[in-house]
Amino acid sequence: MFGSATRSDATRVLLLGSGELGKEVAIECQRLGLEVIAVDRYDNAPAMQVAHRSHVIDMLDGDALRKLIELEQPHYVVPEIEAIATDTLVSLEAEGVNIVPTANATKLTMNREGIRRLAAEDLQIPTSPFEFADQYDDFVAAVERVGTPCVVKPIMSSSGKGQSVIKTPADIEASWQYAQEGGRAGTGRVVVEGFIKFDYEITLLTTRAVDGIHFCAPIGHRQEEGDYRESWQPQQMSDEALKAAQDVAEKVVNALGGYGLFGVELFVRGNEVLFNEVSPRPHDTGMVTLISQDLSEFALHVRAFLGLPIQQIIQYGPAASAVILGNGISSNIRFDNLTAALSRPQTQVRLFGKPEINGRRRLGVALTRREDTKQAVSDAINAAADVKVIY
């Protein structure tokens, strides 16, 4: 049973993180009449614009987080980002607060070490070689053991922040400094990942729901500077590789537990699949599902954590998304030339409503459906380029 928003028996959903992914989750909650409370570290974040009310707090401050949750008494707490005081969520869950999908899943995946050790050591799933380091000297030794080229990432970051590639020993010091500057929780521990040869990488959106495990068609994507630029669905795979990917994803999400949608990132080499990362929430590359499926990743997430059945996911055919990327300084962002973008057949645009920009920032996404994925990607890129950002 669900209560109506703003009434005494309202079913309340509290979003921890209010970016573009949280905004779409909020919209899906609104469609079911739920009361939405959006939280972020800055005011007027995208999800706040479609929520019933909002709060600005430092979500890494456990006391502030506990105080807010005790104030709002939500039926569901839905993390949208990694930078949250997860130990507080674990304590609150033990006291009866419903954390989506679970507090442990949020804690394990908030940093790359927890989830990498779960996959490689506990579940014995193949991954790229990796080492962790806290201090610079240990970092240098880790790079030597893993070998170059290698990828360096803060254990907690997103959208490519703090990530770099070490090609030669001359890159080591700069890579360390960049990782220290880019972590979500400040300076500290990093992971060094060895390069592996792979044919392509995918996101396998996997929903753990009351009626079982459900897979979306695999999503291919291209990244630049550690952040996604385009994604497409379906990514063509052999039956053997797809089955292997689904087996890995099912093991991971079952180990994490709870109900919700998970974005499982995998490398594919022939029919072999290697685990990369997982997010216990909608994934940025999954924005293509806003046009490619009858139930978007956001609708799937909400339906799952509410304990509702998924039944069947219908994929409409080749589709793609392309990021509308801003690069400037402004607190009054405007957009022009939407007419050109939306004059393209089977094309949609989402503008996220971010209140300001200081450098490079994802401001929207263009979505297309076509007869094949190559054409869909090309047209999505062109539609995104049509949109002019005015700073």
Swiss-Prot record:
| GO cellular component: a single term | cytosol
Q: What class of enzyme is it?
A: ligase
Cite the binding residues for Mg(2+): 265, 277
Listed GO MF terms: ATP binding; magnesium ion binding; phosphoribosylglycinamide formyltransferase 2 activity; phosphoribosylglycinamide formyltransferase activity
The protein's annotated pathway: Purine metabolism; IMP biosynthesis via de novo pathway; N(2)-formyl-N(1)-(5-phospho-D-ribosyl)glycinamide from N(1)-(5-phospho-D-ribosyl)glycinamide (formate route): step 1/1
Q: Which domain of life is it from?
A: Bacteria
Reaction equation(s) it catalyzes? N(1)-(5-phospho-beta-D-ribosyl)glycinamide + formate + ATP = N(2)-formyl-N(1)-(5-phospho-beta-D-ribosyl)glycinamide + ADP + phosphate + H(+)
InterPro entries, per the entry: ATP-grasp, ATP-grasp_carboxylate-amine, ATP_grasp_subdomain_1, PreATP-grasp_dom_sf, PurT, PurT/PurK_preATP-grasp, PurT_C, Rudment_hybrid_motif
Task: Give me the residues that bind N(1)-(5-phospho-beta-D-ribosyl)glycinamide, please.
Answer: 20-21, 80, 284, 354, 361-362
- Which Pfam family, an example, fits this chain? ATP-grasp
Q: Which GO terms describe its biological process?
A: 'de novo' IMP biosynthetic process
Q: Residue limits of the ATP-grasp domain?
A: 117-306
Listed binding positions for ATP are 112, 153, 158-163, 193-196, 201
Q: Does the keyword Iron-sulfur apply?
A: no
Keywords per UniProt? ATP-binding, Ligase, Magnesium, Metal-binding, Nucleotide-binding, Purine biosynthesis
The UniProt record lists the keyword Calcium: no
EC identifiers of the protein:
6.3.1.21
HAMAP family from the xrefs?
A: PurT
Recorded hits in PANTHER family, A to Z, give: FORMATE-DEPENDENT PHOSPHORIBOSYLGLYCINAMIDE FORMYLTRANSFERASE (PTHR43055:SF1)
Please explain the role this protein plays, according to its UniProt record.
Involved in the de novo purine biosynthesis. Catalyzes the transfer of formate to 5-phospho-ribosyl-glycinamide (GAR), producing 5-phospho-ribosyl-N-formylglycinamide (FGAR). Formate is provided by PurU via hydrolysis of 10-formyl-tetrahydrofolate.
| Record-linked NCBIfam families | PRK09288.1, purT
Quaternary context: Homodimer.
Q: Give the family per the record.
A: Belongs to the PurK/PurT family.
Q: What is this protein called?
A: Formate-dependent phosphoribosylglycinamide formyltransferase
Which source organism?
Photobacterium profundum (strain SS9)
Cite the source lineage.
Answer: Bacteria, Pseudomonadati, Pseudomonadota, Gammaproteobacteria, Vibrionales
